[in-house]
UniProtKB/Swiss-Prot annotation:
It comes from Escherichia coli (strain K12). GO terms for cellular component: ATP-binding cassette (ABC) transporter complex; enzyme IIA-maltose transporter complex; maltose transport complex; membrane; plasma membrane. The gene is malG. This is Maltose/maltodextrin transport system permease protein MalG. It is found in: Cell inner membrane. When MalF EAA loop mutations are made concomitantly with MalG EAA loop mutations, a complete loss of transport and complex formation is observed. This suggests that the MalF-MalG interaction may be important for the proper assembly and also for the correct function of the transporter.
Length: 296
């Protein structure tokens, strides 16, 4: 026999569902509006959510194709969006891999080894990470300007310089992976040592396979942070062809001519790499975030 819910419980359930729907609508509306702007004729930021007439002109320009106007004029692509997208994926991918590698080895040292000043180093890393990157922009510019004189591939206007700058943001990830490592019983590594494994082999063959969920989380968070970052990339990159998509999209918002439709199409394209990476790694995301809590 089905249980009859009291009216008060039904009302609470209805209100809960209504609030959830309103919350989802508040999140989805800006995204749908950006898509709608990219499908409208002209470069206008205002208008209905559903375009009266769908136009693919902005998408053609973003993909590098010329567009023929009604009067016969040919409009070439104003900016190399696909090149910017590739630059973004390249910089974010290499940065994320480097951050995972550095964070994992540092976290292993803090979780398994004993050395003087370990607690001080951990706290210091976390404190320095609390300050926003914009506070160090002047210092970063001077640093990479000087580094470029000796090591050209990590100087100004190079992707290597941007990647090198992003590798500095590992403190929070070190804490997260350290907490995950501390949840793994050290007896597994001791058993591997009894079988003749070196510390490096125990780390590589025992600890790393058990840490795939948290490594996937760190990779996703690092990838998203790098592909959406603007201040550091806009400071270090000068050449238009070297821009990442997040930096290059600002070129559409010229004070004399706001290209909102083209900007919206490029904005939607910028979300594709993040969506693909998230979908590929989502099965590890919840487990990694749950088990990777910072442990004292």
């Amino acid at each position: 026999m089905a249980m009859v819910q009291p009216k008060s419980q039904k009302a609470r359930l209805f209100i809960t569902h209504l609030l959830l729907l309103l919350f989802i609508a508040a999140i989805m509306f800006p995204l749908l509006m950006v898509v709608a702007i990219s499908l409208r004729q002209g470069n206008f930021a205002t208008g209905s959510l559903i375009p009266e007439q769908i136009s693919w002109d902005h998408w053609k320009l973003a993909l590098g194709f010329s567009v023929e106007q009604a009067d016969g004029r040919i409009t070439p692509p104003p900016f190399p969006v696909l090149l910017w997208l590739w630059n973004s994926v390249k910089v974010a991918g290499i940065s994320a891999i480097g951050i995972v590698a550095l964070s994992t080895t540092c976290a292993y040292a803090f979780a398994r080894m004993r050395f003087p000043g370990k607690a001080t180093l951990l706290k210091g890393m976390l404190i320095f990470q609390m300050f926003p990157a914009v506070l160090s922009l002047v210092a970063l510019y001077a640093l990479f300007d000087r580094l470029g004189e000796y090591i050209p591939f990590i100087g100004l206007n190079t992707h290597g310089g941007v990647i090198f700058a992003y590798l500095g943001g590992i403190a929070l990830h070190v804490w997260t992976i350290k907490g995950y490592f501390e949840t793994i019983d050290s007896s597994l590594e001791e058993a591997a040592a009894l079988d003749g494994a070196t510390p490096w082999q125990a780390f590589r063959l025992v600890l790393l396979p058990l840490s795939v969920p948290i490594l996937a989380v760190v990779f996703i968070l690092s990838f998203i942070a790098a592909i959406t970052e603007v201040p550091v990339a806009s400071l270090l990159l000068r050449d238009v062809n070297s821009y990442t998509l997040a930096v290059g999209m600002q070129q559409y918002l010229n004070p004399q001519n706001y290209l909102w439709g083209d900007f919206a199409a490029a904005a939607v394209m910028s979300a594709l790499p993040i969506t693909i990476v998230f979908l590929l790694a989502q099965r590890w995301l919840v487990n990694g975030l749950t088990a990777g809590g910072v442990k004292g």
